[in-house]
């Protein structure tokens, strides 16, 4: 069984790491290079950087931050936020990223996933999906499930999250980064039903995201949600737990991890 990964997530805006609740109420968490170096020392398997307002603000890529981080950190870096084209993938890989994450751009132009995957390999291409459980009213007409949101969670696309994940994997995504908007920042645990539904539907790794409040939540994402990796932010940023403590806990739960 492959080792399961713990991935701290750094949401970046205005050159700073921030953390919010349900995609709003942002709170400063520090300097991205300093925080990345700390996680590198703690034994994180990877890091994910998301420029959370790049698409909605129409901003360019955070290349200068990635270059600074890549000069000090020697674990895989995934970068998302404002990634729109195959050329953006090239620029980020040249800056030191190992993977690039598409979100809104894949919704606007699904072909970009095929093109980027064909040019750079599926292992470099992550599709991030921000999903929210349908309201009771919507569920009555469309059935229970989750819709995909774009533009930093501001716009409901009306697409079914499981169907979209399946299409993205088919088009060449090497991983799915799956965030529950309902759970984001709430510390109430992953949406395990969502995680399991997507994990069962696709044949590429799924990274569970949104809602981690304790170490059991991380283990549950793997064992109950079927995720291949778990992503968390606030429990690590504010010093509640270290990555090493998280790995030790997961190992005690019988999950293979790299110590």
Swiss-Prot record:
It catalyses: 5-[(5-phospho-1-deoxy-D-ribulos-1-ylimino)methylamino]-1-(5-phospho-beta-D-ribosyl)imidazole-4-carboxamide + L-glutamine = D-erythro-1-(imidazol-4-yl)glycerol 3-phosphate + 5-amino-1-(5-phospho-beta-D-ribosyl)imidazole-4-carboxamide + L-glutamate + H(+). The active site is at 11, 130. Its EC number is 4.3.2.10. One of its GO terms (biological process) is L-histidine biosynthetic process. GO terms for molecular function: imidazoleglycerol-phosphate synthase activity; lyase activity. GO terms for cellular component: cytoplasm. Pathway: Amino-acid biosynthesis; L-histidine biosynthesis; L-histidine from 5-phospho-alpha-D-ribose 1-diphosphate: step 5/9. HAMAP family: HisF (MF_01013). This is Imidazole glycerol phosphate synthase subunit HisF. It comes from Polaromonas sp. (strain JS666 / ATCC BAA-500). The gene is hisF.
